Amino acid sequence: MNLSVRRIAPGRAEGVALVARVPFSFVGGSDPMTGEVLDEASGVRGERLGRRAFAFPHGKGSTVGSYTIYGLAKRGLGPSAILMERADGIVAVGAVLAGIPMVDRVDLGALLTGDRLSVDADGGRVDLPDVDSRDVVTVFVRNRGRLLIVRRSEAVGSFQGKWSGISGYLEGREDPEDRARKEVSEETGIRDARLVAAGVPVISRDRGTAYVVRPFLFDVSTRRVRLDWENVESRWIRIDEIDAFDAVPRLEDVMRSALAGREVRKG
């Protein structure tokens, strides 16, 4: 799998991913003398930054963080590369001073700690040679402000028993909108669904597979659904109720992307 990213600090590097799911401060969050992660909230406390491709949403804290990054690199304890969802000045300055390749606009959902990866900041690319990607559509149908979610059957190939939107694989060069319409018809029996919006893709990992999820929002005139073999149960919910369900990874992110997506106009 490969990701298109934006260069912040130039260079190329390889390493094993170390992924923190929360904003990170190098000041207080790491030991400047050992490179050990100290921040409990990071989820990777006790790991060492040295020679790792360190990924996190964005930086926080003091401007001293720039010099902390530089100091780690001078001691040979710094990360081989830095990957972020959104770059900030503190980390960017530190990466430039330290000569560490840095990129942003990275969907961290594509990465797991332990992934082998290479970063080509100059080419705007991150490669994950051990990860396969699958393109899927996930559709949310809406009626009077509530969204349909379904519980996946034990007969499907992934995420059995989890709650999801209406989903299906894209094959070859199939048009995502066409597949979305087919999935709604096949999995709900609703024929008059009206396409409203298409969201920004969201990446969700399941071990060695990364699912590139393309979100869609349809409006429907009924809450009466006829499930096929892929799903065994359905609910109409508000988005703020999603935490009560054992859902597939990043379902709320996919739902929000669909709701905030670009409007699809007829013709």
What positions do the PLM features span?
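Feature captures the catalytic cores and cofactor-binding loops of soluble hydro-lyases/lyases
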Residues: L3-P10, A17-R125
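Conserved Nudix-box catalytic region and its N-terminal flanking loop in Nudix hydrolases
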Residues: R146-E186, I190
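Extreme N-terminal tail/first-helix region
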Residues: M1-G15, V131-T138
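NUDIX/MutT-family hydrolases
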Residues: L217, R226-A258
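Conserved N-terminal beta-strand and adjoining loop/helix that marks the start
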Residues: D130-L148, S167
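A short coil-to-beta-strand element that immediately follows conserved catalytic motifs
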Residues: I190-V200
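Active-site-adjacent beta-strand/loop module that shapes the phosphate/pyrophosphate-binding cleft
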Residues: N143-G145, P201-V225, R235
